[in-house]
Structures are given as structure tokens and as C-alpha cells.
Amino acid sequence: MPGTPGSLEMGLLTFRDVAIEFSPEEWQCLDTAQQNLYRNVMLENYRNLAFLGIALSKPDLITYLEQGKEPWNMKQHEMVDEPTGICPHFPQDFWPEQSMEDSFQKVLLRKYEKCGHENLQLRKGCKSVDECKVHKEGYNKLNQCLTTAQSKVFQCGKYLKVFYKFLNSNRHTIRHTGKKCFKCKKCVKSFCIRLHKTQHKCVYITEKSCKCKECEKTFHWSSTLTNHKEIHTEDKPYKCEECGKAFKQLSTLTTHKIICAKEKIYKCEECGKAFLWSSTLTRHKRIHTGEKPYKCEECGKAFSHSSTLAKHKRIHTGEKPYKCEECGKAFSRSSTLAKHKRIHTGEKPYKCKECGKAFSNSSTLANHKITHTEEKPYKCKECDKAFKRLSTLTKHKIIHAGEKLYKCEECGKAFNRSSNLTIHKFIHTGEKPYKCEECGKAFNWSSSLTKHKRFHTREKPFKCKECGKAFIWSSTLTRHKRIHTGEKPYKCEECGKAFRQSSTLTKHKIIHTGEKPYKFEECGKAFRQSLTLNKHKIIHSREKPYKCKECGKAFKQFSTLTTHKIIHAGKKLYKCEECGKAFNHSSSLSTHKIIHTGEKSYKCEECGKAFLWSSTLRRHKRIHTGEKPYKCEECGKAFSHSSALAKHKRIHTGEKPYKCKECGKAFSNSSTLANHKITHTEEKPYKCKECDKTFKRLSTLTKHKIIHAGEKLYKCEECGKAFNRSSNLTIHKFIHTGEKPYKCEECGKAFNWSSSLTKHKRIHTREKPFKCKECGKAFIWSSTLTRHKRIHTGEKPYKCEECGKAFSRSSTLTKHKTIHTGEKPYKCKECGKAFKHSSALAKHKIIHAGEKLYKCEECGKAFNQSSNLTTHKIIHTKEKPSKSEECDKAFIWSSTLTEHKRIHTREKTYKCEECGKAFSQPSHLTTHKRMHTGEKPYKCEECGKAFSQSSTLTTHKIIHTGEKPYKCEECGKAFRKSSTLTEHKIIHTGEKPYKCEECGKAFSQSSTLTRHTRMHTGEKPYKCEECGKAFNRSSKLTTHKIIHTGEKPYKCEECGKAFISSSTLNGHKRIHTREKPYKCEECGKAFSQSSTLTRHKRLHTGEKPYKCGECGKAFKESSALTKHKIIHTGEKPYKCEKCGKAFNQSSILTNHKKIHTITPVIPLLWEAEAGGSRGQEMETILANTVKPLLY
């Protein structure tokens, strides 16, 4: 056993016997890991000797190593000035002179008291060995050893130093002489000692005889191989009995035992932490005091260790003595060169036990291991943030200090860290030494290359425990975790806004400062970021050095060329496992995958809405804050995003840099070009899980999903209306503000959006780029083409949940829903009238404004809306592009054709809930409903009369103006309405396309056919609420209602007679003018009304269209049929209020009422019989009144 008296008799073991020596040149050849290993071994050896009581006192070399100093970092003059106990050249050879006997006694008192040796039983509390009952023989043997050790002392003549061995003394003497007898044959280097020469030879030995079977790595020495093998093995045979900890080597266990056994007598008063050595305590205290005694003379920066200062000085000197033979790159440290060499060899000897991942450096493995643990022992006193590493805490503290010591000499920009300055310098030099073998992309740093390689390998070692998402980098995982925790450690001092990343805070601060440090000398334009400056430089530079060999196209950037090459290769390396779709880039695949997962990790705290990307969430938040930091210098308009400002500027410049290869059309935005390209392809990769509908774009699918969700997050503060999208809310707000910033230079019309202006301009240019492949019809917009295609396919994707009705447009569904809800959110500020749609309100406002901006160049007529002008122009052009396949009838509008088709199909999809009546058009149903509600929203400002339809009001206004703009070219007759002119023209053509299936009669108008059909069916849908009488026409009901009200608004200017309807007044006027425009072709007789001519014609034809269903009798007029039917029913609907007698005809009732109005009959008879003049008078009255009733 070591430490027994027997072992001491064999001779004193000294620290010199177990010390390893290196010359300054050899020390510099060691890398950091080897230097650290040397320190650990030296300290371990000393502790073992001290534990056994053999080390008399601490050597100066151990003191240096404990303080973290390098053996060769002290200057020559500093060493000479030391006390005489130290040799300035080779301090490791010496032991300071002291009382060796006294030292041994101290060892005995301190160590053997705890040892429990049977021969050295010391009583506790004894001050010296003599006071204790010690076995005399054992103590004498110790004294003999002491004497033996003292006899082996050799002294240096120059520095009066003491040696315990002649070998050490002889070696020390050779060093003073400076004689170097051992010369290297490979180089000019020579050495004092043969051992140093042998060690030096290892540099030139190419063969490495010791090979590791695990990883095939080779080594010069078997001892190095043995140490290396421990990396691969998990075996730890040496276990500590005190704490249970296991070790691979016995020496490590021995060192560990000292830690367990040795009392930590050096305690820190600040935090209570205890240490084995006073030197360790001294270093530790600097954490609390912040003491940095080692100062750099160049820049004034101070350090806590001299070794750190020595490394720092190389930044100023630029010294890089260690050069890589592979690539020629030089380094300031051998350890950095050793790490660098692994880039070329690909060696990764350090493996993680947790996940099996291998690393090229032990430090990288140590950093990696932290990812598996959640412990964060290093806490910041400023903000309480905790860190896993001390180095990260140190870097973090710079944020609070705001100190920027490292300044760029080129542009003057300062940085917190030297590494950031080094990275920054590459901007000026453009150096990128690390190149990817896969794609040829170059990088400034090897670490950047390593990160880049993961894109090709798809390796994602860092996984989130919360959601399972994996990342390429630990830093990305750290940032991702903040999504779950909600942590925002970086706070803006200006506005208090907090951020998850320091980089985002830095960018945010620029909003407050407005600083643009990166300026381009060519045009003087300044930028906030260096990246933006680099991109801008390409605009000025015409150079395109990267050329495609396939097509000859040149590019400014190599990455763009790489992306371009994929077009020729057709290669899509990144495939989706869900749907099989392939992509050119991994980023595109990642974006695509979210479609399948539907994951939305980023949630808005204000409204709860979730987003796929953090950037989208940031943009969304500006809706709540209203922040718009980007302002246009031309018009002053502000935007929330720089990209939106860039797009906006193109309105002023007219720039359209993005061109379509298919059709040559140019666009101002790349996104618009991308959307345009879809018009050339039929692919629809995005499918809705709810209704199986497919879409060309992900954004359209996202918008579509809102229909199913019914969610309306965006609410208007003015009127409370909610919307599915923020864009819809923005559009809605213009109703309240009335703002229209985009004006048409052609006609002066203003619009809310630039896109609306662009659409409007096509009216002037008549451009129609979107063509239907089915029928060849062209459209201004792709959306119009999409809707048009549904005519051919019959597709109706938008279904009403209330009644099940389907629609081809979402807007039509939205309008339809208001039938069920009755909601009218759009209110006119002028008159208080409410509307279901914003478009209806916009049209309504024109009534108050009275403004007519759109003027016809042909006839000078002006209109409120451009659509009305467009409709009007067709009168002059007579163009009717929409033709019916059934009857060949042509129409101006496709919508009119659609309505017309329902005549042939008899489709009536719109049903009235009150009476069950169905209509082919929703507008007809809306008009019909007003019969039940009595609503008359359209009021005449002249006479105050109200109407249920705007068209009726328009027609009514002509009464006051007398205007008749629509003139017949055949006969010169003018009309107030275009529809009346159309009806009139049929008189000249004789065309009757509408035929009755019951009797075969044909009509020139569909409305006439509808009225005629009611003769056969007997349908009378229009009922009077006053008396219950029903009518087959709404006009008859309107006329009838006037009986109850007594109102006669239409007055004849000639005789003052008033009439219920305008048509009756027109008929009456012909009495004064004697005009008879309707002439019979058979006999030449003329009539003042067309209806009278129709009835007259039946005299020639003998036609009796009105047939009785009971007896088959036919009549020329409907009124005659109505009277006849009463014979069969026996119905007597007309009752006398005076006597209660009922009649089957209203005319008989009218005659009957006269009985009650005349003088009583009997007294009149008496007076008539009496004779005389009075009797003759009474006789006349009876003859004229009573007798016709009696006979």
C-alpha cells in the first residue's frame, strides 16, 4: 500500500519524478485539448503525492497551472525580478528552500490523523508529533526517509536553487549553458535533451502504427491510442466508495478521492462556495469583484487571466503561425488548426451517448449535451434570465451594458463581440473560403457550411418536446420554445414592446431612430441593413457573371443560377409523403406540409387567431396596433410593411419588371405574375376537406375555409359589422370615410384600391386577356372567366345551409343569406335608409348627390354609373352578343340571356315564404315580397309619391320631366323607357316568340304570356288587404287600391280630370288630341289604345280566346268569361250594404244602389194621381227612375 512506513524506506518519491517537461517550442505545438490534458495530469500527480504525504510543498509550476497560466507566458525580465528561490528560465525544475522536517510534521498532523494507520495513531488535538503517543519505530523510519531526501539535494550555482535529484540538476545546468547537442535531421531545429528531440520527431513521422479498431484513427503512441479508446468504451470500472461515482481510469478515481476526502477550507464570503485551493478561490472571487488585472496595451481591454490576454494580443498582431497544408489557411493557435483539419478529414471522434450524434470537437459535444438537459445554472442579475453556459451569460450581459468595443476600420460600425466584427469584415472583403460540394454555394464560415449541408442531408437533430417539431439548429429550437412559453426577453426601451429574438429588437429600434447606416456611393441611397444594400447594388451593376450552359441565360447571383438549373433538369428532389407532390426546394416542401398538418403555432393574444408563421403573426398584430412605419414620399401614404410600400411605389413609377413567358404580359409584382401563370394551367393542388372543392392557390383555400367556419374576427368600430378577412374590413371602412385615393385620368372616376383602378382602365382600353376555351368569349378578369366557366360546367359550389340552394358565386350566396336574416347593415346618413349590400348603398347615394359623371358621346345623355352608360351605348351600337339557342333571340347581356333561358326551362328557384309563389329571378322575389310588406323605399322628391322599385321611380320621374329619350326609327314615336321601345318595335316586326301551350296563342312579350296563362289557370296572386279581392296583375291591384284610398294622382291639364294611373291619363289625353295611333289593317279603323285594337281584331278573326272550363263556351274578352263563370258557381260576391241583397256582377249592384238613393215610390204615385203641374212632374220622375227597374 502506498503511504505505509515500508514504502517510505525505499526512498522518497518527488514531484520531479512524475513531472512531464516541455520546451516553449514543444508547448506551442500542443493543441488546447493536449494542453488541458497536461494541466490535469500535473495537478493530479501533485494531489496524489500530497494525499500520500510525499509532496513537501506546492511547486511554482502547480501554482501557475492552478491559476490557468501557461508555463511560457511570462516575460524574461519578470522572471529575473522574482525572489532568489525561482529560476526565471526553467521554474519547473526547482523546489523552494524550506524546512523539510517541518513540512513532514505538518503532513503527519493534517493527513495521517484521518488515515487510520495502526502505527501512527495520533490523538486529536495534539499540536505536535512529540505530544502524541506514536509508535517510536515508525516515526524514526519517517525521519530516516527525511534524512535520505535531504541528502539528495543539489544546488544551482547561478540561482542558488535546490534539486532533489542529480538528474534534474544536470538537466538544469545544460539549459543554462544553452548548448543544444541533439539536432533534427529533417529541419534545422536542435534540442538540449534527447527526449525533446524524440518528441519533436513525431511531427515528421507520416506512419502512425497505432490504429483504433472502432473508428480507424491512427496515432503515433500506444498511450495516446489507449486514451483515445476511452471515447468509444462505456466501461467505468473504478468506483468511488464515498459518492458512488465511476471512472474509466484509476488515476482519475485517485484525483476524485482527494475531492471527496479533502476538506474545502477555502470558502467564498459572497456566495458560500468552497474550494480545495486558494488559487481557485482567488479566480472565483473575480466573478464577484469583476477584477481584470491583465490589461491589453493596444485597446485597453482587460482580462481576468493572463492566458486570455495572451490569446487576445494575437488579434492586434495578426500572428498566425499554424498553417493548414490542405488549403493554406493560417491560424493563431495549434488547437484551432487541429480543429480545422477535421473539416478536410471529416473526422468526428466525440460521440453523444444520448442520441448517438458525433462531433469533431469535445467542446461541441459538451455544448450539444446541454440540449438534452433543461438545467440553466447561470442567471443574469439584470433581467433574471437563466443560461446553460457561462459564456452565453457573458455575451448576454453585453446587451445590458450596451458596450461596443470592436470597431470596423472600413465603415466605422461597432460590435459587441469580436466574432461579429470578423463576420462583418467579410462584407468588405467578400471572401467565402468554404464551398459546398453538392451545389457549389460558398460561405464565410465552416459552421455556415455545416448548417447548409443539413439542407441536403435533411438532418434535424433538435426536437421540441412540446409539439415534436424538429429543427436543424439548437438556436432555432430555443426560439421555437418561446412560442409555447410566450417568453419575450428582448424589450424596446422606447415603446415597451417585447420580442422573442434580439435581432427582431434591433430591427425594431430602427423604426424609432430612422437610422440607415449602409449607404451606396453610386446613387446615395441608404439602407437599414447590409443585406438590402447588397441586393440594391445588383440593380446598378449590369454584370451577370453566372451563365446557364443550357439556354445561355445569365444571372447576377450563383444561387439564382442554381435555382434556374432546376427548370432544365425538371428535378424536384423534395417530395411530400402525404400527397406525393414534389418541390425544387426544401423550404417549399416545408411550407406545403403545413397544408396537411394544419398546424398553426403562432397565436394572436388580442383576438386568438392562429398563424402558420411568426412573420404572419407580426404583420397581423399591426391590425390591432395600427402601426404603419413605412411612408411613401410621393403621396404620403403609410404602410405596415416595407414590401407593401415597394409595391405601392410602382403605381407612381409604372414599373412592371415581372413578365409572363407564355403571353408576354408584364406585372409590377412577382406574386401577381405567379397568380397570372395559373391562368395558363388547369392544375388545382389544394383541396378542401369539408366540401372536396379544389383550388389553384393555398391562399384561396385558406379564404374558402372561412366559409365553413363562419368565423368573423374583424369587426367595424363604426357600425359593428364583422368580416371574415381583414381586407374586407379595410374595404368596408371606406364606406364610412368615403376615401378614394386612386383616380382615373381618362374620366376622373376615383377608386378605393389601385386594383379597382386597373380594372376600370380596361373599360377605356377594352382589353380582355382571359379567353374561354369552350365558347371563345373573352373577359377582362380571370375571376370573371372562372365564373363564366360555371355556365358550361353547371357547377354551383356555394350552398345555403338554410334552404339548401346552391350558387355559382360566394357573393350571390352572401346576398341570398340576407333573405333569411333580413339584415340591412348599410345605412344612408342622408335619409336613414338601410341596405343589405354596400353596392346598393353606393347606388342610393347617387340619388342624393344627383351627380351624373358618365356622359354618352353619341347623344350627350349623362348617367350616375358607368354600367348604365355601358348599357346605354348598346342602343347606339345595337350589339347583342348573347344569343338563345332555343329561339335564336339575342340579348345585350349574358345575365338577360340567363333570365330568358328560364322561360324555356320554366325554372323557378326563388320561392316566397308568404304565399308559396316561385320566381325565376331573386330580384323578382324581392319585388314580390313588397306586396306582402307594403314597403315602398323609393320616394319621388317632386310629388312625394313612394314606389317599391327604383325602376318604377325612374319611370315616374319622367312624368314630371316629360322626357322621352327612346325613339322608334320606323315610325318616329318616342318612349320614356328602352323596354317600352323594345315592346313597340314588335308591332312593326310582328314577331311573337312566346307561345301558350294551352291554346297555341303567341305573344310578343314574356310578361304578356304570363298574364295570358293566368286566364287558363285562374291564378290571382295579387290580393287586396282591404276587401280581399284578388287580381292576376299587380297593376290591377294597384289601380284597385285607389278605390279604397280615393287617390287620383294623374291629372289632365286640359280639363282637370284626375286618374288613378298614368296609362288611363294617357288614354284620356287622346280624347282631347283625338289621336288614334292604333290602326286595324283589315278595315282601317283606328283606336286610341292598343287593347281596344286587340279586342276589335277579334271581330274580324272571330277569335274567342277565353274559354269556360265548365261548359266549353268561349268569349272574346276575359271580363265576359269572368261574368259567365258566376252562372256555374252561383256566386254572388257583390252585396248591397243597405238591404243585404247580393249580385253576381258589380254593374247590377251599381244599378241596384240607385233604388236606395231615389225618393220613396208610394208618395210619388199619390201626387201623380192628384194631377196638376206637380202630378205631371212626379209622373216624369217615375218614368225615368222606377219603371226601368220594375220592367
Curated annotation (Swiss-Prot):
SMART domains: KRAB, ZnF_C2H2. Pfam families: KRAB, zf-C2H2. GO terms for molecular function: DNA binding; DNA-binding transcription factor activity; DNA-binding transcription repressor activity, RNA polymerase II-specific; zinc ion binding. It comes from the Eukaryota. Belongs to the krueppel C2H2-type zinc-finger protein family. Transcription factor specifically required to repress SINE-VNTR-Alu (SVA) retrotransposons: recognizes and binds SVA sequences and represses their expression by recruiting a repressive complex containing TRIM28/KAP1. May also bind the promoter of the FCGR2B gene, leading to repress its expression; however, additional evidence is required to confirm this result in vivo. It comes from Homo sapiens. Keywords: DNA-binding, Metal-binding, Nucleus, Repeat, Repressor, Transcription, Transcription regulation, Zinc, Zinc-finger. A zinc finger (C2H2-type) spans 154-176, 179-200, 208-232, 238-260, 266-288, 294-316, 322-344, 350-372, 378-400, 406-428, 434-456, 462-484, 490-512, 518-540, 546-568, 574-596, 602-624, 630-652, 658-680, 686-708, 714-736, 742-764, 770-792, 798-820, 826-848, 854-876, 885-904, 910-932, 938-960, 966-988, 994-1016, 1022-1044, 1050-1072, 1078-1100, 1106-1128, 1134-1156. GO terms for cellular component: nucleus. Residues 13-84 form the KRAB domain. ZNF91 is only present in primates and emerged in the last common ancestor of humans and Old-World monkeys. It underwent structural changes between 8-12 Million years ago, probably to improve the protein's ability to bind and repress SINE-VNTR-Alu (SVA) retrotransposons elements. The keyword Repressor applies. It is found in: Nucleus. GO terms for biological process: regulation of transcription by RNA polymerase II; transposable element silencing. Its main location: nucleus. This is Zinc finger protein 91. InterPro entries: KRAB, KRAB_dom_sf, Znf_C2H2_sf, Znf_C2H2_type.
